[in-house]
Amino acid sequence: MSRKVTKYSAVLAVSLFAAALAGCGSENKEGTVGTGPGGVATVGDTACVQCHSAVVDPLTGESIITQYTRSFHYSKGVGCEGCHGGGAQHNGVGPLPFPLAGQSEAQIAARCASCHNGVIAPLSSSPNFVNGNHANPFGGEEAKENLCSRCHSHEGAIFGAQAGFTGDGNILRNAAYQPVYPQDPETFNVMTCATCHQHGGAQRQVFTQISTAGVPNSRRTVAWDPNRNSINDQYDLCTSCHTVNTMTGTLIGSGNVLQIFTSNAVGSGTKSVTTAPFYHNTRWFRTLPSTHYDFPESKTTASGTTIEGYVIRRNTANPCFDCHGHEFQTNTRRLAGADRPNTIFLDWGQSAHGGKLLQAKVAAAALASSGAAEVDDVMKAGATDATAPGWTHYNWDDTASRGACQRCHTSTGASNFLNNPAGYDRTGAGNSFTHLAGWTSSNKRSDQNELLYCWGCHTKAGTGELRNPGAITEVYPGINSTSTGTTGLDVTVSYPDIKGSNVCMGCHLGREVGDNIKAITDADGILGFVNSHYLTAGGQLFGTTGYEYATRSYANPAFFQHDKIGTAAAPGTGTNGPCAGCHMTTPTSHLFLPVTKDGTGAITAITSTACVTCHAGTFALTPEGLTAEEEEYVASLEALKAALAGKGILFFNAHPYFYRDTNANGIADPGETVSSNAFTNWAGVYGLALWQDVMGAAFNANLLIHDPGGYAHNRFYSKRLIWDSIDFIFDGVLNNDVTAAIDAQVTATRLDSATATAAKAYLGTTRP
């Protein structure tokens, strides 16, 4: 095959999907004569077509002009001369400013990048593609084999797609479906841009073969359309090799019938799910649905659902680009290894945002027998309440019951909020989950759940472009209850603009703040607990979330710098604000962890470069020192819990979090931790005038118990909240008797002496 033609076919096949190309400086396709790129006069597309309409794609035989008219370039008025330069000196034989013949792939990519620079047009993806697995397959010899070449070579992929050699293992293993290649597969090459893109950049069409059951000689070639939307789209193209389901909707897997648990009760409720065999159906990491499908009805034997995989938005224009650009390199077949360089995908799959899904998959594979059984077991493994309750515990896409939660417990809600915080409907009414099985605009619920996917935070995963909500102004809704006669005003907090970290702030600010308690009017101080919610680190960082006692100062000391990380005020710590500056400046950025820990929870290394930049010399951090501070932080919260228990207020880590100590033993007994026994009489501790301060102490405990990094985010704010809460709840007076209050808990056997010692070491002998 002509190498010139291969390059000619590939010229415009680099990342042409995302934005209008008006402004590239090219002549339009209608033939307006002027000066084109390269400074040579243009002649218009009509003149080009006169000669080049006879030039065909060397593999499909289709006219390159026909292909070009299907391209994004054509639809946006970017003519032939927009890429090749003016043709006035060409006339079929003369020079072109930007010819393709004889040009290297690097030269062609550079020409594309003259527009695809990320400003005029989407950034060229050529560098990512060149370094990815498609251009550098694990086994180059696979491209030379007749069957394997279908998905492991440039020519085989195009020939196979045209011949309808596409589908599950039943098709690919059937000799009757295999095409007769017009050339020896030994001559085939690895994939290029033109493998997936026609001349001009349009996506290639893929075909498959179907037949009518029981009807002889009914086999026919039809468009491959597994998402059944009658559109030649990205899902069709990518799944022609990375197959997810058949044309009839059958899930790809081992070919076995899977038994899926559908009940939270042990040993009851299963559903049979038929799978069609993938060609590579004996290794889980070669079968895409093992990580890219969530069984709708699956449950665990405790509570909540199981999320077995990512849910692809099949009917969007670029569902694969929701997470993948042109890098095509995930390295997720196992968690680590010298031959598996780290990737964002490897990080995310082990992160809390990803529900630690990959860890569940790898663990299941390690326990499974080999072959098809491995595929089956890994397909059924997933995130559960044990590892990812924030994603699995409720049916978050059920708008009627969980609409208010969708902003932070679904990617759909998160992306919609970050796109337009001011216009976001906090009831969830504006969120559409039609990509989830069974969810419609009328029933508004599905049994599938989302994790925090790439597109929740990013607009373009391939370039890493983040959504841009701007500085967050959070309106914490007032507490109102007709049943208790409670009324409350909204509390508005304006947070600073911290660039990329604004994205993190969207979900790490809490649902209520301490000032919500102060804004309540209640006649008797008997009402439900005001819940801060979980992981409110952003609010702690800026000192806004806690219940602050009157007469006490909570201002940061002058030397406090954590809220300035990732800004110009803290050179060398990045430019994307404190959240990204601390949690994403590590070799494993999308684990979102600034440290590593061993199996006991002890910190083994501080990996965030921001920590090292600031904490040097006398103030250098060590893993041992940071572990000790974390343990003392936890101990101080145990002391606060004990002090609350001394007043009959028991903490238990389940909503509504505080319960009555009916037997006065200071322990949250099973019969006490039920919703009907929730603690509500806040005025009963120190009288109606002080009910808010009593609830405030409980609020601060709940707030910081659910911020496990509170000792690092803003240790001054955290220490002051804990100190003041213990100080007040002990005797109803702010008199700095915290040491005595902690010792009293030991005397009452609500706290052991070792924990008390650690708590006092953390808080000190005077108010922090």
Curated annotation (Swiss-Prot):
Keywords: Cell outer membrane, Electron transport, Heme, Iron, Lipoprotein, Membrane, Metal-binding, Palmitate, Signal, Transport
Gene Ontology MF term list: metal ion binding; oxidoreductase activity
UniProt subcellular location: Cell outer membrane
Binding site for heme c 12: C611, C614, H615
Its membrane topology: Lipid-anchor
Pfam families attached to this UniProt entry: Cytochrome_C554
Gene Ontology CC terms: cell outer membrane
Binding of heme c 10, residues: C504, C507, H508
UniProt-annotated binding residues for heme c 5: C193, C196, H197
PTM field: Binds 12 heme c groups per subunit.
Tagged with keyword Metal-binding: yes
Annotated binding of heme c 9, by residue: C454, C457, H458
Residues reported in the UniProt entry to bind heme c 3: C112, C115, H116
Residues annotated for heme c 6 binding in this entry: C238, C241, H242
Binding site for heme c 1: C48, C51, H52
Gene3D superfamilies to which the protein is assigned, alphabetical: Flavocytochrome C3, Chain A
N-terminal signal peptide: 1-23
Positions contributing to heme c 4 binding: C148, C151, H152
Residues bound to heme c 2: C80, C83, H84
Chain residues that bind heme c 7: C320, C323, H324
Residues with a covalently attached lipid (S-diacylglycerol cysteine): C24
PANTHER family in alphabetical order: C-TYPE POLYHEME CYTOCHROME OMCC (PTHR35038:SF8), DISSIMILATORY SULFITE REDUCTASE SIRA (PTHR35038)
Main function: Not involved in Fe(3+) reduction.
The name this protein goes by in its record: C-type polyheme cytochrome OmcC
